[in-house]
Amino acid sequence: QRAFFKSQVPFVDTPQDLALFSAMYNFASKHKFKYVITGGNNSTEVVRESVDWTYFSTDTLHAKHIHKKFGELELKTFPMRDIFKYRIYDKFISGMKIIKLLDSVPFIKKDAIVELKSLYGWQPYQQKHYESRFTRFFESFWTPKKHGFDKRRAYFSSEILTGQMTRDEALERISKPELSEEEMQKEFEYIAKKLDFSIDEFTEIFKGKNKSFRDYRNNYFLITLGAKISNLIGLDNRKFR
């Protein structure tokens, strides 16, 4: 995580996403699972963010290059599962199938929240992914303030297209941050401490020159080529932008 902050790319959450994804699919592959159930769905995730906002966390060539330039520890036990192993080996050789249960039933986010609250006493968090304190800081402060984009635009666009939010409602939410300036400052100090940066070091990184995934080695060409071929033969319908 420190290496990704130092690299100046916007998607500093890549290490945690890569670790979680890789650990799960490594375990599934080791035990020869044929089905993996996920919460992914078209109802709230039909709009994909630009790759300049969120690059492929499973491009291990990219992650390893950033770590090589800025990392301070060896990655002996850090779980890594490359996108090609996931897309080719898991799906076509081992026969693993990804099941998105929420796409099999009518799924309306607001109705789901009401049901979870009434049945289980669940307390909703402010915004998508804000169950993670790091992600809350990253999406509410780091990317808007440093890199100039708000990931809520993609989230709300999905809900607009599926009739769960109006454009006016989305614009009203986008017009103001989810956290106050005081809360953001507290989170800035908290994350800096957790990552063992001094406030001055973290501030220097924040003010540094922004970079893109294109500034580091990557498999973008091969990934997008594979996606285009999959689209042509009907195996995939994702569109990258």
List PLM regions with ranges.
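Nucleotide-activated chemistry modules centered on ATP-dependent adenylation/adenylyltransferase
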Residues: 1-241
